[in-house]
């Protein structure tokens, strides 16, 4: 018998080889939404996975961001299985997120019609209605690879081949269709009743509920410019044969890593030069606003773009939004009483816009400097006056929000959205989430420059994401230009820095430990890459240093 300690301290005994599913069903009335996953000794655990040792047990319900990942993974498997059943010659590839939706590209010669997509959606809803079981198979490596041959690409099979021979792998089955998706799934299709499929571009959109509102299906909001940026990155990475982890590993093994670094950095330089050309062509331009989520590389982008602007004869002048914080005594507070420095109201908008108007009118302005120690703005004699061809460059989370600069007419400003839209994936069904890549960047940067351990970064990440959802993502569609800061090789470089930080997170850290173990599993598939040949002005240097 195995002894399991529940989150309330209760210890129960279960048979070795039993699963968490009966226990989850027994405790379901204590949760506000369905339990979709277990935490077994702090690590993510499928409810149908056999237990083999004593340990601690907790459960994850669907109505949060972690549980919603299980929901979406299950939904993807339902889409794969339904498509295989109805249209065996159709091959879908999971591409990128668009808000609370996923875009899947149809790579087959026989393209899905709108009627085909409706048929697939109806089939999936019938799966949910009859609670079609999703079986979990734990197979030796050789057997798992044999079964995976029917569903996995050569790149994914190469990744499976590199795991130790004694590894037991998980394969799922839905109506006889095998699936190899990284991470736990729901026990049956009935757990995911809320979704819709929509024809989109060269494929289909899977629309599903937002985190925290699992029973509400929001309307799909198209973001064509963002999707175009994703598609451009994916097509470029495929063109240079480096769009999967398996291909990146092969490039590293063959000794071609330096070349791929040079090509990726050259792409950034080319894109920034193109943006600078666009800015130079706007003869009335006076203000460039740069915004993006955490660890998207805003600071390096602003610095490198300023150099390219100078090449075009412009005179970029950086202004820090931090210097326009209200004095701390006047700062807004959160519900818990702590200061809210992320909201727009934390900025002295009246003073900021007054200074903008005076600067654009050619006046000399005494510029403030915010003292974070005292919590007050100070004036240290710094004055600014714009010259001919001067352009203000302002980086900050609210740059896309029109309420930040209502005093500046639209013809005098350009808004740039910066984000790390990674095109890298493991295979056609297992993508690398952009948020995970940004989290790795932030964790490494916090360790290198802020003396924060990984546990601290992981604990605060939810608050960071909440701020992004409030203050950045709602305005990204208003950007005039999107710059993608991802570097196709960075996953392999971040591995060297991130793994020791993640291993140091103790099991007592709760969900921070769970996230650390999940990220370590993702990183285990990529081979490490040294960073000596990465140029000093690379956006990646903002995070790894050097």
Locate each region found by the language model.
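Conserved lysine of the Walker
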Residues: 298
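Hydrophobic positions on the alpha1 helix immediately C-terminal to the Walker A/P-loop
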Residues: 301, 305
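Conserved nucleotide-sensing/catalytic segment adjacent to the nucleotide-binding pocket
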Residues: 317, 326, 330-373
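Conserved NTP phosphate-binding and transfer environment spanning the P-loop NTPase/kinase superfamily
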Residues: 283, 405-546
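Glycine-rich phosphate-binding loop used to anchor ATP phosphates in small-molecule kinases
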Residues: 353-411, 458-475
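Hydrophobic anchor at the beta1->P-loop junction of P-loop NTPases
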Residues: 288-290
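Auxiliary tRNA-acceptor-end handling modules of aminoacyl-tRNA synthetases
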Residues: 49, 56-68, 91-270, 275, ...
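Ubiquitin-like/PB1-type beta-grasp interaction modules and other compact soluble beta-rich domains
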Residues: 1-76, 80-100, 109-110, 122-123
